[in-house]
Amino acid sequence: MGGPRRIFLVFGLILMAAIVLPACGPGSEAPGEAMLADSPAGAEPGAVPEKYRDLVNPLAGDPEAIAAGSQAYASLCSQCHGPQGAGDGPAGAGVDPMPGDLTDSARMPTLSDGYLFWRISEGGSFDPFNSLMPSWGTLLSEREIWELVSYIRTLSS
C-alpha cells in the first residue's frame, strides 16, 4: 500500500471507529448469532448484484493470498468480526445486526465468492442488511479483496 492509500485506509478506520464504537454496549445476542440477520437467506444467491454474482476467487487456496488476507483481516475486520472471525470483536458488541460469524461451517460454504466479494466491496448499509459494515471497495484493490476472501474461507474450515 502506498502513502496516499495508507492515509485513506487510516482515515477509513478512524471513521469506522467513530461510527461503530458509540453503538458498542451489552448486546442481546450471543456473538455470531446474527449471521442470518447479517446475511439474510434471500440475499444469496438471488439478491447478489449481477456484476458480482458469477465471480470466482482467482486466488482461492493460494498460500500467499491467504497470508496477505490474514494481515488485512487483522487490521480491517477483526475489530468487529473478532480475531478468529466468530463475530465477537469488541467494536461489534451491541451492534444490531451483530457482525456475521465467519467461522460458521454450515453457513459459510453456502456463500459464493461473488457474495463475499460484494459484501466486502459494498459493505452493508443497505437493505436487506442495514448493518454498519463499511464499504472497502474504494480502499482496497480487487486483488486485496480476493486475498480477504481467501483468508475468510479458512476461518470456517
Please provide the spans of the model-predicted regions.
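Bacterial N-terminal signal peptides that target proteins for export
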Residues: 2-11
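Alpha-helical transmembrane segments
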Residues: 14-18
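Electrostatic cytochrome c docking/interface patches
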Residues: 36-72
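Bacterial Sec signal peptide processing site at the extreme N-terminus
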Residues: 25-39
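Residues at secondary-structure transition points
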Residues: 60, 64-67, 93, 107, ...
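Periplasmic/extracellular electron-transfer cofactor-ligation site
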Residues: 27-29, 44, 48-51, 70-97, ...
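C-terminal motif of bacterial Sec signal peptides marking the signal peptidase cleavage site
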Residues: 21-23
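Extracytoplasmic electron-transfer domains, predominantly the class I c-type cytochrome c fold
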Residues: 96-152
